[in-house]
Amino acid sequence: MPTIQQLIRKPRQPKIKRSKSQHMEGCPQKRGVCTRVYTTTPKKPNSAMRKVAKVRLTNGYEVISYIPGESHNLQEHSVVLIRGGRVKDLPGVRYHILRGVLDTQGVKDRRQRRSKYGAKRPK
């Protein structure tokens, strides 16, 4: 426990809150170009082939982002828009690709939560 004199000399420093998506630089979304599109397996209790892409952002950073929804049309050099939000069972994946924006197509035959997957309203 510091004395009052010590606190006068050197006051307490507030804790610095670090962003969980630092490469976004405070932006809600960022544009980037896919450098590699591949599948990877999740952590221990889960089992799947999760679709991810390595994306080079406009600010120069290279991040791994998750491709949500069933099937996608992404390949190398596709221009995508990413948002923050990690995938809990994929280490190092801290971003999501937005579907239905730029080169990414929306999910076909999606009926519920369509706005999350860039799907148009079914007729």
From Swiss-Prot:
Function, as annotated: With S4 and S5 plays an important role in translational accuracy.
Keyword vocabulary terms for this entry: Methylation, Ribonucleoprotein, Ribosomal protein, RNA-binding, rRNA-binding, tRNA-binding
Family: Belongs to the universal ribosomal protein uS12 family.
Region spans: Disordered: 1-30, 104-123
Protein known as: Small ribosomal subunit protein uS12
Subunit structure: Part of the 30S ribosomal subunit. Contacts proteins S8 and S17. May interact with IF1 in the 30S initiation complex.
Modified residue annotations for 3-methylthioaspartic acid: 89
Biased composition regions of type Basic residues, renumbered to the chain: 9-21, 110-123
Domain of life of the source: Bacteria
UniProt record, GO biological process: translation
GO CC list: small ribosomal subunit
GO MF, one annotated term: tRNA binding
